[in-house]
Amino acid sequence: MFPMVTGFMNYGQQTVRAARYIGQGFVITLSHANRLPVTIQYPYEKLIASERFRGRIHFEFDKCIACEVCVRVCPIDLPVVDWKLETDIRKKRLLNYSIDFGICIFCGNCVEYCPTNCLSMTEEYELSTYDRHELNYNQISLGRLPMSVVDDYTIRTILN
């Protein structure tokens, strides 16, 4: 055939192919138009953390027997356990317990292997601060339970 006619045929096929691709993209775009928005207005809306969420560690001072299992299973030897041996009863007495959340990787090994269950993970994840030294929590600050997102009336909770 003539080169001009074949050029017009190729041009027509390319035009049809381009229109089909544009139509497919438009169909995909329209399929997303009727979905609900997924944006969360963070300070005023929060997602409820799942049951297995690994947030800040909660520590119960009275249950701890200063066995230091948490230190041994921690991949970075993070918890600092200070204890004193009571010679009359031949038991360890816990003096101080602290965790630096600036270094903690929230692996959960300390919680999993604690024999007395004095450690547990909370749903608190808002640990940001301007000074990294404020992330070093002692037994008093570790013992405070965080305010539950569900109980906070100023925040609208959103289920996953």
UniProtKB/Swiss-Prot annotation:
GO terms for biological process: photosynthesis, light reaction. Belongs to the complex I 23 kDa subunit family. It is found in: Plastid, Chloroplast thylakoid membrane. This is NAD(P)H-quinone oxidoreductase subunit I, chloroplastic. Binds 2 [4Fe-4S] clusters per subunit. Signal peptide: none annotated. It holds the Pfam family Fer4. It catalyses: a plastoquinone + NADH + (n+1) H(+)(in) = a plastoquinol + NAD(+) + n H(+)(out); a plastoquinone + NADPH + (n+1) H(+)(in) = a plastoquinol + NADP(+) + n H(+)(out). One of its GO terms (cellular component) is chloroplast thylakoid membrane. It is a peripheral membrane protein. Its main location: plastid. Its EC number is 7.1.1.-. NDH shuttles electrons from NAD(P)H:plastoquinone, via FMN and iron-sulfur (Fe-S) centers, to quinones in the photosynthetic chain and possibly in a chloroplast respiratory chain. The immediate electron acceptor for the enzyme in this species is believed to be plastoquinone. Couples the redox reaction to proton translocation, and thus conserves the redox energy in a proton gradient. It comes from Cucumis sativus. Residues 55-84, 95-124 form the 4Fe-4S ferredoxin-type domain.
